[in-house]
Amino acid sequence: MLEQMGIAAKQASYKLAQLSSREKNRVLEKIADELEAQSEIILNANAQDVADARANGLSEAMLDRLALTPARLKGIADDVRQVCNLADPVGQVIDGGVLDSGLRLERRRVPLGVIGVIYEARPNVTVDVASLCLKTGNAVILRGGKETCRTNAATVAVIQDALKSCGLPAGAVQAIDNPDRALVSEMLRMDKYIDMLIPRGGAGLHKLCREQSTIPVITGGIGVCHIYVDESAEIAEALKVIVNAKTQRPSTCNTVETLLVNKNIADSFLPALSKQMAESGVTLHADAGALAQLQTGPAKVVAVKAEEYDDEFLSLDLNVKIVSDLDDAIAHIREHGTQHSDAILTRDMRNAQRFVNEVDSSAVYVNASTRFTDGGQFGLGAEVAVSTQKLHARGPMGLEALTTYKWIGIGDYTIRA
């Protein structure tokens, strides 16, 4: 089955690479229209997935990721239209010039070819990834979580109908609808057909891909994100940022999971934090330095377990740790962070600069929420993933991250001397 999918994707990629920006946008507009026109089919499939997931004991955080509503589906269709408005990087001349030999040389952006994406129970990813791949002239093979099997099948069927109505092969966007995990291992060895693999999931999936894949892999999406509250932070303003970073949508990878509090501000900061977290329904997992003081406040508090510093809660839970200074905070982030998104709240710009320079994450913030790490927020449109590695892309992966380049030499029957 996968062999045939690979062949179809590779053939489709050749046709996609020849499309103009206008032609690609026409396809995307058709997909957006069809997602809305056939929304009832997709929503019914999603309702079945959600019901099964709830019956199987899936957490509320995961159910939130899985669930579609009419408003969310309309938002997904609107996101596709936003991709139409983005500049197409394919064909862009990055640099070039005329050599001494007279050869005119250009370095030009081109599609990667076929992208493979393995992802969790988030049905919006199916459309986001497909739209970005199509915009950049890439075919894509999708392997979503088993919890979204019906939703993904219905969504991809709509996309393929739109492709065919525009004269393009259905092989441009395909989904593996068999939940058998053995197919993941088979997919990891499809280097004959897949040019880049993006796993979006937990540490176990990333480890499997790094160890078994014969395809170049870009990992990311695990977000153990930190906020360090420096001793000079403005408490009221800091709390607004923390509430946003923790509660706006707890199930996302850019949500803060650990709060590091400078010991010199703890006495005034922790009572205010407890009040705010109680109002927001957040459970605090406190270290010994913060536990006693937080227990006198209104927020629910438990003693933090050492392993929780490495957890991506994806829920209304927040670690709180007292640190001695900036060095202590940076050391903690280096030990427990996932190089996703980390922030400092401070009025001391020297400390801010040190934090920016010394915290080796894909996104580092000064006096801002970690929730900004998102393709849409960065002006990149929808994203394929948030890469936490350094090659070939880092941070939110928009259109440019789905391209490579080729060197093009144009001569007049020019020969090398």
Curated annotation (Swiss-Prot):
One of its GO terms (molecular function) is NADP binding. PANTHER family: DELTA-1-PYRROLINE-5-CARBOXYLATE SYNTHASE (PTHR11063:SF8), GLUTAMATE SEMIALDEHYDE DEHYDROGENASE (PTHR11063). It catalyses: L-glutamate 5-semialdehyde + phosphate + NADP(+) = L-glutamyl 5-phosphate + NADPH + H(+). Pathway: Amino-acid biosynthesis; L-proline biosynthesis; L-glutamate 5-semialdehyde from L-glutamate: step 2/2. This is Gamma-glutamyl phosphate reductase. It is found in: Cytoplasm. Its EC number is 1.2.1.41. It comes from the Bacteria. Catalyzes the NADPH-dependent reduction of L-glutamate 5-phosphate into L-glutamate 5-semialdehyde and phosphate. The product spontaneously undergoes cyclization to form 1-pyrroline-5-carboxylate. CDD domains: ALDH_F18-19_ProA-GPR. GO terms for biological process: L-proline biosynthetic process. Transmembrane segments: none annotated. It comes from Escherichia coli O17:K52:H18 (strain UMN026 / ExPEC). Gene3D superfamilies: Aldehyde Dehydrogenase, Chain A, domain 1, Aldehyde Dehydrogenase, Chain A, domain 2. Its main location: cytoplasm. The gene is proA. Keywords: Amino-acid biosynthesis, Cytoplasm, NADP, Oxidoreductase, Proline biosynthesis. Belongs to the gamma-glutamyl phosphate reductase family. The keyword Nucleotide-binding does not apply. Pfam families: Aldedh. The lineage of its organism: Bacteria, Pseudomonadati, Pseudomonadota, Gammaproteobacteria, Enterobacterales.
